[in-house]
Amino acid sequence: MGALRGRWAEEEALRFLLGKGYRLLWRNRRTPFGEVDLFMEKDGVYVVVEVKQRASARFGAPLEAITPGKVRRLLQSARFLLGRDDLPVRLEAVLVHGTPKDFRLEHLVLEL
């Protein structure tokens, strides 16, 4: 997510997930496979959260930016951060539609 532009969207996504009982483990953690926006835990499952924001549909919907390659890299990043690949990991996305003054959130589980 772009540094300053997307920071507010990431803050809103984090607030939303914390309100749903998620626990933050790492934020903006870099790995050899890319950056993980939010690495969280919920009910004993590790959760990698990708946050995507779009002010308008001009450049496509936020979900369109999460390609199969991105999903693969997120899973590789999770395994790297955990140091093993036998723990339950779920990939999720928080899509932020709009601007800081007028937005809505969409929360999805990504298929592996």
Swiss-Prot record:
SUPFAM superfamilies assigned: Restriction endonuclease-like
Q: What is this protein called?
A: UPF0102 protein TTHA0372
GO MF terms here are: nucleic acid binding
Name the family: Belongs to the UPF0102 family.
Which organism does this record belong to? Thermus thermophilus (strain ATCC 27634 / DSM 579 / HB8)
Q: Where are the transmembrane segments?
A: none
Q: InterPro entries recorded for this chain?
A: Restrct_endonuc-II-like, tRNA_endonuc-like_dom_sf, UPF0102_YraN-like
* HAMAP family referenced in this protein's UniProt entry, alphabetically: UPF0102
Alphabetical list of PANTHER family matching this protein:
UPF0102 PROTEIN YRAN
Alphabetized Pfam families for the sequence: UPF0102
